Amino acid sequence: MGDDAQFALQVQALKEDIQRHVAHTLGGDPYPPRKGRYFLGLCYSVRDRLVTKWLETQRSFYDTISKRVYYLSLEFLPGRFLMNYIQALGIEDVCREAVQSFGMELDELVEKEWNPGLGNGGLGRLASCYMDSMATCCIPGYGYGILYDYGIFYQSIVNGYQQESADNWLRQDSPWVFRRGNFMYKIHFYGRSEVYHDSSGA
């Protein structure tokens, strides 16, 4: 089979997957195409392909009894995932062609993704760089952090006073999050708290 025929098959398969997710994952009507639904349909379709490779990688680690690195950080700032995953899978042209067939542009859909609010500082960027480096060097590594509801906040000045507003990045849930309610671990924080009043009554 030629490259053009293979490309056409990949585009057709992706189009069908996007519409399937719009209908069966989101419970929405694929017609007429709507950017919000098709953005999520594309995310879930990319995730399907990503998970297949992820599971293959996991099996190879277990089969070779590889040592693994576990990186614990209170913050991660990976940036938007969709285009990063599309490029890592080598399917950017396939995605562009599939999305254009629905009368949309890939760049428009990519812009609909919220930045994950998993932190708000240089520590988070550094942690994400470590994870990228481990992946590039084929080092089995896992990042562990906190799934914040409000990991980032916005600041504004109103009448001369600073005001903060939360960034609810999970308001529409995230297509990249696997919620595993059957796995629960107790995390203990040791120490004690003491309550007292000083001489000023504070």
Model regions: which residues?
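A conserved ligand/cofactor-binding region detector
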Residues: 1-202
